[in-house]
């Protein structure tokens, strides 16, 4: 696309430069009279103008018809979606631990269920003949720089900066949200207001 547009701009520049000489001789790019056709310079100038118009028309069109020009959205009917799922308490506890998100009330659970229901629309998308993408970089060779040590042995100094270490490894601190026990959580959900 860039090559065609760049070529089109060069042709437009050339036609602009030639067009001024044609204009002074009484020829425009829109019409050619029989008298002007006798002059080869004027006729070639008008041919360039016509060629530029054609190239510009074809270069501004989108060449890939698979990609729509405007985003499209079709509503998905409820009967096309899989049945709604109820999230078990064990899964909610695990999600809270992994994502550090607090679902301590009925409103948080309802928001999570709505998000899952919205994502269920992906089941309707036709993916026949589409290979799953394993990695974004699956077609590229990754060139890594040499692993050269820039400074001296500083592993001991870095490990002293951490509060918790096991052997030669940092220990990640637990989540910043204190999670209640399962019994406390069930009691909170029963007494929470929606």
Swiss-Prot record:
Main location: mitochondrion
The entry's keywords: ATP-binding, Ligase, Mitochondrion, Nucleotide-binding, Protein biosynthesis
EC number: 6.3.5.-
GO MF annotation, one: glutaminyl-tRNA synthase (glutamine-hydrolyzing) activity
Top-level enzyme category: ligase
This protein's GO CC annotations: glutamyl-tRNA(Gln) amidotransferase complex; mitochondrion
Catalyzed reactions per annotation: L-glutamyl-tRNA(Gln) + L-glutamine + ATP + H2O = L-glutaminyl-tRNA(Gln) + L-glutamate + ADP + phosphate + H(+)
Subcellular location: Mitochondrion
Gene Ontology terms: biological process: glutaminyl-tRNAGln biosynthesis via transamidation; mitochondrial translation; regulation of translational fidelity
The protein's assembly and partners: Subunit of the heterotrimeric GatCAB amidotransferase (AdT) complex, composed of A (qrsl1), B (gatb) and C (gatc) subunits.
Other noteworthy facts: This protein may be expected to contain an N-terminal transit peptide but none has been predicted.
Task performed by this protein: Allows the formation of correctly charged Gln-tRNA(Gln) through the transamidation of misacylated Glu-tRNA(Gln) in the mitochondria. The reaction takes place in the presence of glutamine and ATP through an activated gamma-phospho-Glu-tRNA(Gln).
Protein family membership: Belongs to the GatC family.
Protein name: Glutamyl-tRNA(Gln) amidotransferase subunit C, mitochondrial
